[in-house]
A protein has these predicted regions:
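Conserved short "hinge" loops at termini or chain/domain junctions
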Residues: 1-73, 111-134
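Short, charged, amphipathic alpha-helical segments
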Residues: 35-36, 103-107
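Short, hydrophobic/amphipathic alpha-helical patches that form generic packing surfaces
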Residues: 82-94
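Generic alpha-helical propensity signal that fires on short helical segments
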Residues: 98, 106-110, 127
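Generic detector of ordered secondary-structure context
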Residues: 33, 80-81, 101
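Structural motif
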Residues: 73-82
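Charged, low-complexity interaction regions
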Residues: 26-30, 95-100
Length: 134
């Protein structure tokens, strides 16, 4: 799967996201749960961001599960990759019933995800209907 940022860009892997989250937010959730949650966010990236732009078909994504290699590169590049940590933190907060923390985590996630979406819109041409000239 080619990353969104071409050669020379810096990206995060599944295991890096999990390790960084566990370091800043110790929790009792297993690696499989976190991989599933990472699959959710990259599924959103694929469906709502990359597939709506030219070249989106070059980015393949079929989801992550326990059999996915942990060195798989995630889709959102630096400096927007903190979205992964905020998303995972929000999922944990919600599962733990910590709704005020969940709201804070989701606010941070939404801000970063929106910034990433805007970056992608500037970098890649959105798909659209072709204009017919008479």
């Amino acid at each position: 799967m080619p990353p969104i940022v071409k050669k020379g860009g810096i990206t995060m892997t599944i295991i890096e996201a999990i390790n960084r989250l566990d370091k800043i937010k110790p929790n009792g959730y297993g690696q499989e749960d976190k991989i599933e949650w990472l699959s959710e966010i990259d599924g959103m990236v694929k469906q709502t961001v990359t597939d709506t732009h030219e070249g989106g078909e070059d980015i393949s994504f079929t989801g992550y599960d326990a059999t996915t290699p942990l060195d798989t590169v995630l889709l959102i590049p630096i400096p927007y990759d903190s979205a992964y940590l905020d998303w995972l933190a929000a999922k944990i907060d919600f599962a733990d019933g910590e709704y005020a923390r969940y709201n804070n985590s989701m606010t941070r996630f939404n801000d970063t995800f929106l910034s990433f979406s805007r970056f992608y819109n500037r970098k890649y041409m959105p798909k659209g209907s072709k204009i017919k000239y008479f």
